[in-house]
């Protein structure tokens, strides 16, 4: 009887020990894959993304692990880097440019992808903004609205603007998104010359062609390739005294006349919201893609002076930042 009781006690102790061991096992730490184009260019935005994640309780190295993979301007590496993240079995992939979103989309149909691009429907990433329908969701902005505003602001800066060159690269989203700029220009009564660049050496040829055609300004279409080679572009714009509306604030800091764009720091913060939803079990197919509500209009007054442009006060008052 005593022997049987001892065995029962031992069995109970073993069960309790097993239960404690199970409870003591650490919870699975979510792993986020970040597929980026350029670590230097996106450093500020990544910091904003991480800061917002902390507000949701996610701290890199403690409550989450973020696996970064950077192409550093080499688009041919994106497929390999996306495959690495898939092999790591990350819980979600975050990415923010058409080429990198495309690479992630091709690498997996099951791992959720949180992205930000312009015109995700036109580029085939989602079926609809309200119901994406696949494994991709995030934040997006529409070319048509931004293009019209950018051209209108450039027209306010350049008197009698009737001819404009549009600089583009296919890796920025393709011709479909360039058409939005063309349509916006025609709406404003502006003639358009399309100039595609594929290699760094194409910039000088393109700007020379724009000047020969009689372009009074240039609109730069969003493109990771152009961003990578922006110094070449900005040098050519300065040498040819051509006013331009560029893609990002960084261009304006470095010498472009102006930019009107969604506030990308705020967009990257917003991506943390989507990551939180997914880590809590939401399906990307059911998470509506939202559109930014905050935009920045940055003007370089020094560049305007070098171009001989007297920017009207009505234009400067619209700016969120004036670089002097």
Regions flagged by a language model, labelled:
Residues 1-324:
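Short hydrophobic alpha-helices and adjacent helix-cap/hinge residues
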């Amino acid at each position: 009887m005593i022997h049987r009781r001892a065995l029962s006690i031992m069995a109970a102790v073993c069960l309790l020990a097993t239960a404690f061991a199970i409870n003591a096992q650490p919870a699975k730490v979510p792993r986020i894959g970040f597929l980026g184009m350029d670590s230097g260019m996106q450093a500020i935005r990544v910091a904003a993304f991480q800061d917002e994640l902390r507000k949701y309780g996610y701290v890199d190295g403690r409550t989450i692990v973020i696996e970064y993979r950077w192409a550093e301007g080499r688009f041919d590496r994106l497929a390999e880097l996306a495959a690495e993240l898939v092999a790591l079995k990350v819980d979600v992939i975050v990415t923010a440019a058409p080429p990198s979103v495309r690479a992630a989309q091709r690498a997996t149909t099951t791992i959720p992808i949180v992205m930000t691009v312009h015109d995700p429907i036109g580029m085939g990433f989602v079926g609809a903004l309200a119901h994406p329908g696949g494994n991709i969701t995030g934040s997006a902005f529409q070319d048509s609205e931004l293009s019209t505003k950018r051209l209108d602001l450039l027209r306010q800066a350049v008197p009698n603007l009737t001819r404009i060159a549009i600089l583009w690269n296919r890796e920025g989203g393709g011709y479909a998104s360039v058409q939005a700029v063309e349509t916006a220009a025609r709406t404003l009564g502006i003639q358009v010359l399309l100039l595609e660049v594929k290699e760094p050496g194409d910039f000088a040829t393109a700007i020379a062609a724009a000047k020969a055609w009689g372009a009074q300004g240039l609109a730069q279409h969003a493109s990771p390739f152009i961003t990578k080679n922006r110094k070449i572009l900005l040098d050519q714009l300065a040498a040819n005294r051509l006013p331009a509306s560029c893609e990002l604030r960084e261009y304006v800091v470095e010498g472009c006349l102006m930019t009107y764009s969604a506030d990308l720091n705020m967009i990257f913060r917003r991506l943390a919201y989507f990551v939180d939803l997914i880590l809590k079990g939401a399906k990307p197919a059911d998470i509506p893609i939202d559109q930014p509500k905050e935009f920045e209009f940055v003007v370089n007054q020094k560049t305007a002076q070098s171009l001989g442009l007297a920017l009207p006060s009505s234009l400067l008052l619209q700016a969120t930042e004036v670089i002097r």
